[in-house]
Amino acid sequence: MSKLNWNVEGVTESLKAKATALGVDVISQEQVAAIAAELAAETGKDVTARSVGSKLRKEGFEVQKANEVQKSPWTPEQEAELVDFLNAHAGQYTYAEIAAAVAGGQFGAKQVQGKILSLEMTASVKPTEKAAAVRSFTPDEETDFVNQVVAGATIEAIAAHFGRNIKQIRGKALSLLREGRIAAMPVQETSSAKTREDLLEGLDLVNMTVAEIAEKTGKSERGVKSMLSRRGLVAKDYDGAAKRAKLDAKAAAAE
């Protein structure tokens, strides 16, 4: 299985949408692994948690460090058993079947999937047959959706037109973008990023410490630093502009 190419159109947008939808200041390693699994299922490519975490950081998201994760429930012996099983039966069993076969069935399929992702051995797992996709939009509605986007309708307007929520419309737009049926994502009038920006509106940031901003906004200090870095803003004791410049430089170097 080939590795996911972040330069493929729509892939980075999908990643950012998934991360933003979490609505958290700091994305946990567990959430990173879940996003990796979702992208792997959607693209049919090999996607590791490490690559997802790295890409999220380059896009300005705050991601929990791997060494901050609590001790694994897997013992060294259980991990070795899993690795041996994967090496001996590469590509023969699904996550659910592996879960039943190793460690006395102690771990569920999701736990086994997360562990295999962390070991970067997903290529040794038999792909689970995809269930037939349930159509949430009829062919006529899809055509109407495309016409709405071409006409410049916002996500909110499209949601109102079809009587769906923002998440459903965003998901359908991403799907149509990957299929090449629309050239770009429709604009969202009120994004979560705008909401976060509004939290800082009216604050004299350059004369306030991170702790003071955290108290005013109800966010954690780490969350405040993430907001400042993402927008390139400067506080009394934190230079978000410099952090933003470093992130942009890393992203440019990776392309």
From Swiss-Prot:
Keyword tags: DNA-binding, Transcription, Transcription regulation
GO molecular function, one term: DNA binding
Protein name: Putative transcription factor D5
Task performed by this protein: Putative transcription factor required for the expression of viral late genes.
Taxonomic superkingdom: Viruses
